[in-house]
Amino acid sequence: TPLFIDKYNENIKFCSPVSGKIIDIVRGEKRRILDVIVEADSEISYEKMDVPLNEDLSREQIISIMLKSGVWPFIRQRPYDTIANPNDIPKAIFISSFSSAPISIDNDFALYGMDELFQKGLDYIVKLTKGKTHLNVSNNTNPSQIFINAKGVEINKISGPHPSGNVGVQINHIDPLNKDEVVWCINPQDVIVIARLFNDKKYDVSRIV
């Protein structure tokens, strides 16, 4: 269920991660919303999304479904690291499978056993660009097979210390932006969220942190 919408684009919805009721809205300076606090039900229920069974969906159909379901805000746009504009066509899409920052999430562990779901998410994501979808893995470790065996994407091995896992650094080295160009970025666990939407027809944002 949507909690609020983007005032600049009413098609972009921000949905509640749980079923329940809003108990507080925390505002900061100039009434900026800082937190929307939702008290979860004892048993989480999911709204069934209207997702066609046909897997051969067009780019426009995929974007429409993502907007209506509330998963669109997981797609970020560079430059400026804002929510992607669904009316733009990115020159490429970037997914950094690792974080080089200390004490950060291990995506090899977080996505363990989700190979099919991850690939399903990629199958939809690659349709959002006419260019390449770059899946970047660390060359400093042995990346999980979930990333190495991914299909339909360009796999790039990245070496070096922090901030080598930063997607902005990766873009600058692999496919630098020219004037008026944009690229879209997405986190590996959010690829799973998109896959669940099309696979299970529900907005399930559960994840390992």
Model-derived segments and spans:
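Generic structural signal for buried aliphatic residues
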Residues: 1-3, 209
